[in-house]
């Protein structure tokens, strides 16, 4: 047997054969299956479905037809593959959640966003969508080339004469051999506007196109985060776009909130999304959810997520974004067939390819219409000549034995045409006139004359023929103008695009959140002022500032904390939900957290242990919390100043603490008998004021300390302390340029007058009785700061910062407050403004706000006035300031704004 066929066997190298065969297979998949054409944006199967429906008359204006019949026609005529592959493609073109402009109008079950399969093709019905007609319009006018089908029995178009850039409008996706494409859908109006810009200026920059093409427009809506991925995709053809579903937060009563998801990212399975959320809740990767329901219906998506009491909805939503496909990436690969070859193109290249294709289509259509008009004019000229010579025409026909003889006689005769010569020139007919101004009928003209009805012999019909010739002449002139002028051709192209836009464009569904985003949820967190409270037992909470009512000095306050196990409050400050915080622990480590991540509570709540919020080690607890400016650009000019109870200080660069892992980092080395009192951001031109519990204070410039890079250093001596005394606060003050003598002279001016000067009121220099010029007084008044000192027994006073002389670090300091048994030890020292409010908190959990305008301004060496009436064994343990924004006490509870805590910015 082998010998019998040996003469027909050709030995080949198997390696070479594998290369050739695999390459042929790869190109077949690329060109004939998986990659769309840049011109009409369709793969072969989609193109064949639309053309088959068009050929079968299954138009948008006609009744629906069974999908099985359509699939059968496509498979039998053009696409010899499995019926399921054809039907799946038809179904996708009918899904309004898959295509931005569905090309098939389906009736029946065509699947859902839950991943449900469409009903069998014998149950569903389909027809062309109205917009699909714009893909095949003018296909019968020689606009595109046709190829024979797989068995040579039919012809199919190699491409559809699409009137809009379907590749960009509906997108495409496919995996070929060694390459893949993934093009997102866009808004029709924006894409057509970009095409018009390109038509007007072929040298337009891609960034200029981005002015109208904002980004993809997904049929499922949702939102796009950031523009870097969009810019990369449009500039290079590749990019990653972050998609995020849309959600709303609603109050559902009983202090509970619910997250309502109304839009999900493109191509995300809704049922799987709900299952994933439930799975994450079960695994405790998402906490705080009490109920989860899919309430979606025909009116839209609604995923209802009810939260537990006092849970921060924004934090839960952030966890959902991070753990599920509610936020996902769309990897853009703008790969399409151009000139039969796969190519990754940028936005301008895709638009240019489409516009170039439409130029060819319009040119081919114009040539077709020109030829048709000329053919028609040629016949009408023959009819016009015949009517002008009707008697002779009738005589010839009557004298002829048959039609062929009559036709030959008509063609053999020379006919006078001088009277219609203007019409011949008007339509630019290519007839040949002899020297006598006569011509012969062509076979086409003679045949038309023989087929002419007798009613055409009337004078009115002759006039109508002449009018038709004039109209044809106008059309022919326009066609010739289009072919001769590219400018006119582009005008027509632009006009047709605008008509498509006017008919089918719709508002954008996908919103774009400009700016760069990470996995954080900060931009969804409502900005609100919060009171942060820390207890001795390591509990922390945040309470809305509006929960506390403003009270006058001397009021009894309200219960600010329900005491359990005699826990007392050790620190309180006011900040925004967006305030970044550094947490310093007893072992000298530092942790980082945003304020909104703290547990939300009420004034009577205890909060949560910080050990459950931060990754603390055994026997480690937080001793100090430092709020920072929200704008990190300001961090470049800030340092961190550490102060310990033993009087040590250290100046470090704030940028050293910008990136802190969740498990923290070493901040400062502490001796066993020392503790961290305070940490504050500061600038080089500012001053540091250290204050002790015994009423001493020391002021020195920040610049007198060098920046210590080592985080394990315990710093240098800042203040020399007496026995049993310790530093209780550190304040950052403005730097001053005036001399001590000038400051002392200025302080002789009554404080009421100094405040008036600072407000801009005029003053009489002679009445002040000081040896200073007006400019110096005005400058010092505008720069004056006041230091508030509060004692544990509720006494307080305000003193001018000018009264604290500047010395070198390491000294014993000066008297800050005259303390005694009545006043008790000092618990808080800080700079204040005239319209600030003071917040005090006691060891019993009481909290009171009072306006500082009622606190007396005195010298340093005084005992102050009573700020807070205390019960027996009750002590003030923490002090903070609130910037007041409302004149009335009643409004202050409803409209609190501003923050003036320990942060200097």
UniProtKB/Swiss-Prot annotation:
Q: Does the keyword tRNA processing apply?
A: no
Stored Gene3D superfamilies: 3.30.1360.40, DNA gyrase/topoisomerase IV, subunit A, C-terminal, Topoisomerase II, domain 5, Topoisomerase, domain 3
Q: Where are the transmembrane segments?
A: none
The cross-references to PROSITE patterns, in alphabetical order and at most eight, read: TOPO_IIA
Renumbered to this chain, motif GyrA-box spans: 551-557
| CDD domains assigned | TOP4c
The cellular component terms of Gene Ontology attached to this UniProt record, alphabetical and capped at eight, are: chromosome; cytoplasm; DNA topoisomerase type II (double strand cut, ATP-hydrolyzing) complex
Please name the catalytic residues of this protein: 123
Q: Which additional comment does the entry carry?
A: Few gyrases are as efficient as E.coli at forming negative supercoils. Not all organisms have 2 type II topoisomerases; in organisms with a single type II topoisomerase this enzyme also has to decatenate newly replicated chromosomes.
Protein name, UniProt field: DNA gyrase subunit A
Q: Please tell me the species this chain comes from.
A: Rickettsia prowazekii (strain Madrid E)
Gene encoding this chain?
A: gyrA
């Amino acid at each position: 047997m082998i010998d019998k066929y040996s003469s027909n066997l050709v030995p080949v190298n198997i390696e070479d054969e594998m290369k050739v065969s695999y390459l042929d297979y790869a190109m077949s998949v690329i060109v004939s299956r998986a990659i769309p054409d840049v011109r009409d944006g369709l793969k072969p199967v989609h193109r064949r479905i639309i053309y088959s429906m068009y050929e079968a008359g299954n138009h948008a204006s006609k009744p629906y037809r069974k999908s099985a019949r359509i699939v059968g026609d496509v498979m039998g005529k053009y696409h010899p593959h499995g019926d399921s592959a054809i039907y799946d493609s038809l179904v996708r073109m009918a899904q309004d959640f898959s295509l931005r402009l569905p090309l098939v109008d389906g009736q029946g079950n065509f699947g859902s966003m839950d991943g449900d399969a469409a009903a069998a093709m014998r149950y569903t019905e389909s027809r062309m969508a109205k917009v699909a007609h714009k893909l095949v319009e003018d296909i019968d006018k020689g606009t595109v080339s046709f190829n024979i089908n797989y068995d040579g029995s039919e012809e199919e178009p190699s491409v559809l004469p699409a009137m809009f850039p379907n590749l960009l409008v509906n997108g495409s996706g496919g995996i070929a051999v060694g390459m893949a494409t993934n093009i997102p859908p866009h808004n029709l109006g924006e894409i057509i506007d970009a095409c018009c810009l390109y038509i007007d200026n072929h040298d337009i920059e891609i960034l200029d196109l981005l002015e109208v093409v904002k980004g993809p427009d997904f049929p499922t809506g949702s939102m796009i985060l950031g523009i870097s991925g969009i810019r990369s995709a449009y500039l290079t053809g590749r990019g990653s776009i972050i998609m995020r579903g849309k959600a709303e937060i609603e109050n559902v009563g009983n202090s509970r909130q619910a997250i309502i998801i109304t839009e999900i990212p493109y191509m995300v399975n809704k049922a799987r999304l709900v299952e994933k959320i439930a799975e994450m809740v079960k695994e405790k990767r998402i906490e705080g959810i009490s109920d989860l329901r899919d309430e979606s219906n025909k009116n839209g998506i609604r995923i209802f997520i009810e939260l537990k009491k006092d849970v921060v909805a924004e934090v839960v939503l952030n966890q959902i974004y991070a753990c599920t496909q509610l936020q996902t990436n769309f990897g853009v690969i703008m790969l399409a067939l151009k000139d039969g070859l796969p190519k990754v193109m940028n936005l301008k290249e895709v638009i240019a390819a489409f516009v170039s294709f439409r130029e060819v289509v319009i040119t081919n259509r114009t040539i077709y219409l020109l030829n048709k008009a000329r053919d028609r004019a040629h016949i009408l000229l023959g009819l016009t000549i015949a009517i002008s010579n009707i008697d002779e025409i009738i005589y010839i026909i009557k004298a002829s034995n048959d039609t062929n003889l009559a036709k030959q006689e008509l063609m053999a005769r020379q006919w006078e045409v001088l009277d219609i010569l203007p019409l011949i020139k008007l339509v630019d007919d290519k007839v040949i006139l002899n020297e006598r101004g006569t011509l012969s009928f062509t076979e086409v003209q003679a045949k038309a004359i023989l087929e002419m009805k007798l009613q055409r012999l009337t004078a009115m019909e002759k006039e109508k023929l002449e009018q038709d010739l004039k109209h044809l002449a106008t059309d022919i002139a326009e066609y010739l103008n289009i072919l001769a002028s590219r400018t006119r051709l582009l005008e027509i192209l632009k006009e047709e695009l605008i008509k498509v836009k006017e008919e089918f464009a719709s508002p954008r569904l996908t919103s774009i959140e400009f700016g760069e985003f990470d996995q954080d949820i900060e931009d969804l967190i409502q900005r609100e002022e919060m009171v942060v409270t820390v207890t001795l037992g390591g509990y922390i909470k945040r309470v809305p500032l509006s929960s506390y009512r403003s009270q006058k000095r001397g009021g009894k306050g309200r219960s600010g904390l329900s005491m359990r196990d005699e826990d007392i409050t050790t620190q309180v400050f006011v900040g925004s939900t967006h305030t970044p915080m550094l947490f310093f622990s007893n072992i000298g480590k530092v942790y980082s957290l945003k304020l909104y991540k703290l547990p939300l509570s009420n004034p009577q709540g205890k909060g949560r242990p910080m050990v459950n919020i931060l990754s603390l080690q055994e026997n480690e607890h937080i001793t100090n919390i430092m709020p920072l400016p929200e704008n990190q650009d300001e961090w470049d000019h800030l340092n961190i100043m550490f102060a310990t109870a033993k009087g040590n200080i250290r100046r470090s660069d704030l940028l050293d603490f910008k990136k802190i892992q969740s498990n923290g980092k070493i901040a400062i080395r502490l001796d066993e008998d020392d503790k961290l009192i305070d940490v504050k951001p500061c600038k080089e031109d500012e001053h540091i004021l250290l204050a002790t519990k015994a009423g001493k204070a020391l002021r020195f410039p920040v610049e007198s300390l060098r920046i210590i890079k080592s985080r394990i250093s315990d710093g240098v001596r800042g203040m020399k302390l007496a026995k049993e005394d310790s530093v209780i606060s550190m304040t950052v003050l403005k730097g001053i340029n005036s001399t001590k003598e000038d400051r002392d002279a200025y302080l002789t001016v009554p404080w009421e007058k100094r405040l008036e000067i600072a407000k801009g009121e005029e003053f009489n220099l002679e009445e002040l009785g000081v040896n200073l010029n007006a400019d110096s007084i005005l400058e010092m008044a505008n720069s004056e700061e006041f230091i508030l000192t509060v004692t544990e027994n509720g006494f307080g006073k305000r003193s001018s910062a000018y009264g604290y002389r500047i010395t070198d670090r390491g000294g014993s300091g000066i008297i800050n407050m005259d303390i005694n048994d009545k006043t008790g030890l000092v618990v808080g020292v800080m700079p204040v403004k005239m319209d600030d409010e003071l917040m005090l908190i006691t060891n019993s959990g009481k909290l009171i706000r009072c306006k500082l305008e009622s606190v007396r301004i005195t010298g340093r060496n005084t005992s102050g006035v009573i700020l807070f009436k205390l019960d027996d064994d009750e002590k003030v343990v923490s002090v903070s300031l609130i910037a007041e924004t409302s004149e009335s006490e009643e409004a202050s509870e409803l409209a609190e704004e501003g923050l003036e805590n320990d942060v200097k910015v």
